[in-house]
Amino acid sequence: MRPSEYLGLKWQDIDWTRQTVSVVRSVRRLDGRWCFCDTKRSQSRRPIKLQRWIVALLRDVQTKASAHSLCLEGRDLVFKTASGHPIHADYLAKHFKMILELAGLPRIRLYDLRHSAATIALAAGVSPKVVSEQLGHASTAFTLDTYAHVLPHMQDEAAARIEAILFGEKA
């Protein structure tokens, strides 16, 4: 998901039974006010299947938010400030940078996590069409051009598969 999409998520966007989240809006600051806007393009409106550990984490966040009365009227955001307002993407990026520094990790942009997730999914053999839909891209070609980095083990695997076809061996 894009930062503007996950920062605009509301609890009603989560289907706990199907373990999906519906991306239906984005949030951004325009002229000093918060704007709940349409997604980047129509293809960006999509359901995304959540991994079980993410569902468990979100349930925990919801429980804690309810216990601290953070679900304010009209502000049913998943990610919000203590006053119930949306979190600014720049604020989130600043804190992400500080966490990386404290953990001694390389500096990356928060948006790079989107790239990493897409690359990992493709490397794991997830269909490019599925990855493209999860990312909200208009075309699978764009997804592959942007995220399908050739990892070293992929070259080895390709050579082994071709050799197996040519010589009738198991890859």
Language-model features: locations:
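Short, charged phosphate-coordinating catalytic segments
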Residues: M1-V27, K129
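Structural detector for helix-capping/boundary residues
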Residues: S4, L9-Q12, D90, S116, ...
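The DNA-recognition helices of helix-turn-helix-type DNA-binding domains
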Residues: D13, A138, V150-M154, I165
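C-terminal secondary-structure termini that scaffold catalytic or DNA-interacting sites
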Residues: R18, V27-I54, D60, A67-C71, ...
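Short functional hotspots where side chains directly engage DNA or cofactors
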Residues: R18-V23, R109, I120-A121, S132-V150, ...
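Short, basic (Lys/Arg/His-rich) helix/loop patches that form interaction surfaces
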Residues: I48, Q62-E133, H137
